Amino acid sequence: MGIKVYKPTTNGRRNMTGSDFAEITTSTPEKSLLVSMSKTAGRNNTGRITVRHHGGGHKRKYRMIDFKRTTDNVVAKVATIEYDPNRTANIALIVYANGVKSYILAAKGLEVGMTVVSGPDADIKVGNALPLANIPVGTLIHNIELKPGKGGQLVRSAGASAQVLGSEGKYTLVRLQSGEVRMILSTCRATIGVVGNEQQSLINLGKAGRTRHMGIRPTVRGSVMNPNDHPHGGGEGRQPVGRKSPMTPWGKPALGLKTRNKKAKSSKLIVRRIND
């Protein structure tokens, strides 16, 4: 992926950058793998806002991604590399030898014409999926399962990767992108390689309109709200927070408070936390 820099023909264009989509090979997705999406604007079934700053944006269709990779020992050929509006990573359309088509995350270095395969006996090659127990120490991986057969949940965004550090009993030690070291069942699957489109984080949207096009609404500061809307709100003119520390809209400390559930059973599987 390359970064395209726009000329400052207007104020909105100044400093704006975008992807050159050099890796994309087609603009027409596979119809059989598309699902219609209805907009919720961040509301739940009762109409209350459960996710703030959502609404509007361009209409999308969901691409059904195969995060499980359970079609073992059947070679698949990469047919296309495509753009996916629902994620930062690109996706690859693969066609199995039996004719079945599927979408997977496009790893860095994966190109049209290459072959991928999944299963315990798969080679250590970009795009192949296999259990953690069969992946050598030091290998970079992505799309990692937390429960065998559930499908990849970790390390799926553009440019992300994790590294296999070793094994301990029935668990495999994996260092995640954040620096956290976690024990994951060795029967869980992962895909070899780094997620592609790694320069996506360098894109400068340049203007508010591109953000709205993505379905993201403005983020309003709490200090300009009313006191019934935010702990920072109210007062005549500009006022300080009025608390010991900044608060979230729901009245909890905004800085430094650990939000992880202390009773979470998976805590014993975390060997090294992010801030240790």
From Swiss-Prot:
PROSITE patterns registered for this protein in UniProt: RIBOSOMAL_L2 (PS00467)
A GO term for molecular function: structural constituent of ribosome
GO biological process: cytoplasmic translation
SMART domains xref list: Ribosomal_L2, Ribosomal_L2_C
Keywords: Ribonucleoprotein, Ribosomal protein, RNA-binding, rRNA-binding
Region feature (Disordered): 219-268
Family: Belongs to the universal ribosomal protein uL2 family.
Record text on subunit structure and interactions: Part of the 50S ribosomal subunit. Forms a bridge to the 30S subunit in the 70S ribosome.
Protein's UniProt name: Large ribosomal subunit protein uL2
Species name: Lactococcus lactis subsp. cremoris (strain MG1363)
